[in-house]
């Protein structure tokens, strides 16, 4: 347990920030999961934008590093492009 007043305050602040960061990360994971579940549907581009927004928000708040956000955004966009291309090929073969 913290002994000094400043150490007690730092412990409280750390607990608050941890709770806030957990909330942001949870909503980020939810947005990404919903996008991945919607791949191949007409809602995928809309959910991709929501995932991008969540990633940008988390990066701007310092919850995740900006390069991590950029990497995840690139991978999500690549997944959408791959799914869209697969749909186009399937439609052309029919």
UniProtKB/Swiss-Prot annotation:
Q: Which organism is it from?
A: Symbiobacterium thermophilum (strain DSM 24528 / JCM 14929 / IAM 14863 / T)
Member of which family?
Belongs to the bacterial ribosomal protein bS20 family.
Provide a GO biological process annotation. translation
Q: Does the keyword Ribosomal protein apply?
A: yes
Q: Which Gene3D superfamilies match?
A: Ribosomal protein S20
A Pfam family per the record: Ribosomal_S20p
A single GO CC term for this protein reads: cytosol
Q: What is this protein called?
A: Small ribosomal subunit protein bS20
What S-S linkages are listed for this chain?
none
Please name the GO terms that the record assigns under molecular function.
small ribosomal subunit rRNA binding; structural constituent of ribosome
Function, in words = Binds directly to 16S ribosomal RNA.
Query: Which UniProt keywords are listed?
Result: Ribonucleoprotein, Ribosomal protein, RNA-binding, rRNA-binding
Q: What is the lineage of its organism?
A: Bacteria, Bacillati, Bacillota, Clostridia, Eubacteriales
Where is the secretion signal located?
Answer: none
């Amino acid at each position: 347990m913290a002994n000094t007043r400043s150490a007690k305050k730092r412990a409280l602040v750390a607990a608050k920030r941890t709770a806030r960061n957990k909330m942001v990360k949870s909503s980020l994971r939810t947005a990404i999961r919903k996008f991945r579940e919607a791949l191949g549907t007409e809602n995928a581009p809309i959910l991709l934008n929501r995932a991008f927004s969540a990633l940008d928000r988390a990066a701007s708040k310092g919850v995740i590093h900006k390069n991590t956000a950029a990497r995840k955004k690139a991978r999500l966009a690549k997944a959408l492009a791959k799914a869209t291309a697969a749909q186009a090929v399937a439609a052309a073969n029919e």
